[in-house]
């Protein structure tokens, strides 16, 4: 339910076995590994892979409650070699890293792989987390409940992936086929630089949904493939880039605009800690609105000051109708990491229509 209403996804034993093999093969996981999973469902991969796994002392329904000390206790307790955490969990670990003991830091030095997923992971956050695990490879897999993993990318590969529009999630796994269904077009293609919905096929892709027959029909076109609802493109090196959700594409008079690449540009500005780019107005003539959370956020939402507006507009390089500052950006309940752009779009539309500017 991180990108919409919760829904049951059906898997066969064969598909779960294929998922186990895909994860183990991609990350070289053996029976000598030990997993700390700061996201409760991911802890189930431990028994599936035949390795010990624990969940740190945290509120599993609120990943952002994970502290560095709690993670350190878990890693030290089982001698973990693998760590998985959502971006929100990692961010709080970095924020509270001053509470780590020397024993925690020694235990962190034995971790060989740190994985973070559930939403786009900012490179600066991954770098900060990697410094806590000096011997570990930091990587972020891309996928969804219906097919995980689809692709994977390491931190050095992220650093090398510049100049694209969106988040580079790496090359698809060997067992995964990826195609792009062009926006406003038909069919699907693996040609580079075509923007559209990402569709995938893999031995570990879902069988279907639980009693959601229309959803299953829509998500199974073409037959044998899963339509992810994500928008992106493949580059000339075969790497997959994700630009946002299909329902969050902004349909301007100049053509469709995907939000993630623009959000990254805004988040690169000094004093900006988070950003969301949404569309307001009828499809085909939608206007771009940018919502910013600063490093020193206001107590109440407001229109941004002229200086910040100018900096945001220069970074976005598209016409921007308004720039708002907020205290917090609404996020999903599952990972605490995915910005609720639909909610922000409705909030921004009401504010621009003369409504009271309250916190979203």
Name each model-derived stretch:
Residues 112-114, 121, 127-141, 145-239, ...:
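Conserved AMP-binding/adenylate-forming
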Residues 1-18, 52:
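Conserved AMP-binding A3 loop
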Residues 250, 276-279, 289-290, 309-360:
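Conserved C-terminal "lid"/linker of ANL adenylate-forming enzymes
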Residues 14, 40, 88-91, 119-120, ...:
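Alpha-helix/helix-capping structural signal
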Residues 17-34, 40-82, 96:
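Conserved AMP-binding/adenylation subdomain of ANL enzymes
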Residues 57-60, 78-128, 139-147, 209-210:
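Adenylate-forming
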Residues 30-33, 51, 81, 112, ...:
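Short acidic/polar active-site loop segments enriched in Thr and Asp
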């Amino acid at each position: 339910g991180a990108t919409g209403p919760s829904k049951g996804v059906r898997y066969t034993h064969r598909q779960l076995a294929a998922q186990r093999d895909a994860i183990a093969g991609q990350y070289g996981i053996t029976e000598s590994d030990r997993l700390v999973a700061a996201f409760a469902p991911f802890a189930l991969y431990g028994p599936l892979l035949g390795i010990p796994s624990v969940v740190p002392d945290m509120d599993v329904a609120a990943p952002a409650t994970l502290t560095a000390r709690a993670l350190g206790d878990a890693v030290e307790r089982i001698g973990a070699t693998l760590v998985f955490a959502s971006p929100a969990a990692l961010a709080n670990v970095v924020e509270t890293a001053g509470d780590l003991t020397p024993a925690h830091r020694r235990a962190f030095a034995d971790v060989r792989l740190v994985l973070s997923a559930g939403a786009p992971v900012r490179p600066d956050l991954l770098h900060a987390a990697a410094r806590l695990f000096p011997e570990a490879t930091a990587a972020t897999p891309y996928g969804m409940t219906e097919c995980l993993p689809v692709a994977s990318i390491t931190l050095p590969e992220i650093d090398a992936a510049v100049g694209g529009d969106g988040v580079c999630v790496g090359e698809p796994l060997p067992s995964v086929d990826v195609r792009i269904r062009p926006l406003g077009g038909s069919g699907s293609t693996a040609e580079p630089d075509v923007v559209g919905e990402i569709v995938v096929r893999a031995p570990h892709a879902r069988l279907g949904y639980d009693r959601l027959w229309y959803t299953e029909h829509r998500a199974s076109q073409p037959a044998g493939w899963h339509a992810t609802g994500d928008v992106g493109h493949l580059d000339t090196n075969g790497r997959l880039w994700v630009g946002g959700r299909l329902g969050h594409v902004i349909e301007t008079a100049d053509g469709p605009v995907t939000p993630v690449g623009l959000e990254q540009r805004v988040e690169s500005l000094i004093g900006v800690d988070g950003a969301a780019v949404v569309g307001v107005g009828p499809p085909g003539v939608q206007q771009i609105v940018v919502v910013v959370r600063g490093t020193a956020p206001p107590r109440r939402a407001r229109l941004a000051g002229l200086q910040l507006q100018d900096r945001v507009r220069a970074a976005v390089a598209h016409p921007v109708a308004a720039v708002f500052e907020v205290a917090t950006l609404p996020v999903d309940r599952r990972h605490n990491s995915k910005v609720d752009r639909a909610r922000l779009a409705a909030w921004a539309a009401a504010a621009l229509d003369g409504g009271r500017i309250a916190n979203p």
